[in-house]
A protein has these predicted regions:
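Membrane-embedded alpha-helical bundles of multi-pass transporters/translocases
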Residues: 2-477
Length: 477
């Protein structure tokens, strides 16, 4: 790489109207993914009542199959030329309608389907959803290329993270409100999915139509497989790969959330009382991180957030444990308040990794001349697929028994109860442990690799400024 005098990109590029419409698109995109994430497991366990061993197989298949397909999707996305419409915007526009349709189908199961046919149907819809939402995920990628200005980019990404957190929690309110007039759980899920789908499609189409991609880079065609080598050869990338691998084991904890809400509050539909405090805490946490970034570097904040997560989750466990042994409204309210405090940590774990990835992408771009916006997340996904698959495969087996095979779970959750507070005390305490303590431990471990991460402060700024110079050469050439 030839030496060039770094030049800072200070000009702001993103218009207010574009910024707002982009955030609207992000909100309703995550509203759709949030509907799937919050209620799909509840639907499979309490509506379809899939045996835990079969649900483990289902989770394994919908982790491995999409991962293989996404390998080719990542190569396709990063191999695309940046046309007049941009590189990512067209893909998000194309993905909007299929995402909406598949979201609804994820909560609609023909009654005639049983046994193997049912499993084939569920896996097919889930894999198709994964493909559509993977392309739809380019909605998030757009934030990285909307402006060459580093501070403006970080601002866009920060607000994207805040809006994503709120959008992810919105389905909890939607389903709760629907429950006022629709008493059947399956019906509530279908109506909720349909509402999220229609609004999500419209918002994504409007938002992606309004935004512009302004980061220029080489359009030279290269062997896409070389991009994987470039990522794996980057020392900073490995910090994120290892961290995200460890973090994905928290999937066991998040899987328990909706069932924990039922055990504490009587109905899984009341998960909103878990999701909202956590979501609000996440949004506040992101705002706090933005403020703290002026005083501390991102590495320090991420490590500190992991330590905080362990402490606050252990305290939440103690409060919940006390409540289950001596139930009172006061302790119940205190526990829910602690979910807000837990959510503060999500502010760091949701926002900072995306900033780390953006910085590493620039380091790779400076060294290779290539933008690997899809390849890098895919390589990270190799690790998260392994740990996430282990987590999602184990979670149902940890949660509830399967009488058809004689499988005995750790928690002993009983599906299909009218009042979930009827779960045994032992089951409630174990649910609580996995939901809080296990989550805290995983978030602490996710921060450990960052003790060795050096892409912060002046090093980060120097790399960004050099990349800006490099892009100008591509524009001029």
């Amino acid at each position: 790489m030839e030496n060039t005098l770094p030049v800072k990109e200070e000009q702001k590029h993103v218009k207010i109207s574009e910024f707002v419409l982009y955030l609207v698109a992000v909100f309703f995109y995550t509203n759709m993914t949030g509907m799937m994430g919050s209620y799909r497991n509840d639907y499979l366990v309490n509506v379809l009542q899939i045996p835990s061993t079969k649900l483990s197989l289902y989770n394994l298949l919908i982790s491995v199959i999409p991962f293989v397909i996404n390998f080719f999707i990542a190569m396709y996305i990063d191999g695309r030329k940046m046309g007049k419409a941009g590189k990512f915007r067209p893909l998000a526009l194309i993905a909007a309608v299929p995402m909406g349709i598949l979201l609804v189908l994820s909560f609609v199961t023909p009654k005639a389907f049983t046994g193997t046919i049912l499993m084939i149907y569920l896996v097919t819809v889930a894999v198709a959803w994964s493909i559509a939402s993977n392309f739809g995920g380019t909605t998030n990628m757009v934030a990285v290329v909307m402006t060459p200005n580093l501070k403006e980019r970080d601002t866009v990404m920060s607000f994207r993270g805040i809006v994503s957190a709120v959008g992810n929690s919105a389905p909890l309110v939607i389903v709760l409100v629907i429950g006022i007039f629709a008493k059947d759980k399956g019906t509530r899920f279908i109506i909720g999915a349909a509402l999220c789908s229609v609004v999500g499609i419209i918002a994504m189409l409007l938002g992606m139509k309004a935004v512009h991609e302004r980061v220029a880079y080489t359009a030279e065609k290269r062997n896409p497989l070389v991009g994987f080598k470039d990522v794996l050869g980057n020392k900073y990338a490995w910090t994120i790969i290892i961290s995200e691998f460890l973090k994905s084991f928290r999937g066991i904890a998040t899987y328990m959330g909706v069932f924990m809400a039922g055990a504490l509050l009587g109905d899984t539909d009341k998960f909103v009382l878990f999701g909202l405090p956590t979501g609000i805490g996440t949004a506040v946490g992101m705002l706090a991180i933005n403020f703290l970034l002026k005083k501390f570097n991102s590495k320090v904040l991420y490590i500190a957030s992991g330590i905080y997560s362990v402490i606050i989750n252990i305290i939440a466990f103690i409060v919940g444990y006390t409540y289950f042994h001596n139930p009172s409204k006061v302790l119940q309210i205190i526990f829910i308040a602690f979910l807000f405090l837990i959510g503060l940590q999500f502010g760091a774990s949701n926002l900072l990794p995306s900033m780390f990835q953006a910085d590493v992408l620039e380091d790779i771009e400076l060294k290779t001349g290539k933008r690997l916006d899809a390849t890098f997340p895919f390589v990270i996904g190799i690790g998260t697929m392994i740990s996430g698959t282990i987590a999602s495969t184990l979670a149902p087996r940890i949660l509830y028994d399967d009488p058809t095979t004689g499988w005995k779970s750790i928690i002993g959750y009983m599906p299909g109860l009218v009042d979930d507070t009827a779960q045994s005390l032992d089951s409630k305490v174990k649910l609580l442990f996995f939901y809080t303590v296990v989550h805290g431990i995983m978030m602490f471990l996710a921060g450990v690799p960052f003790f060795f991460y050096k892409l912060t402060g002046k090093t980060k700024e120097d790399i960004h400024n050099a990349v800006v110079e490099q892009r100008k050469k591509f524009e001029e050439g």
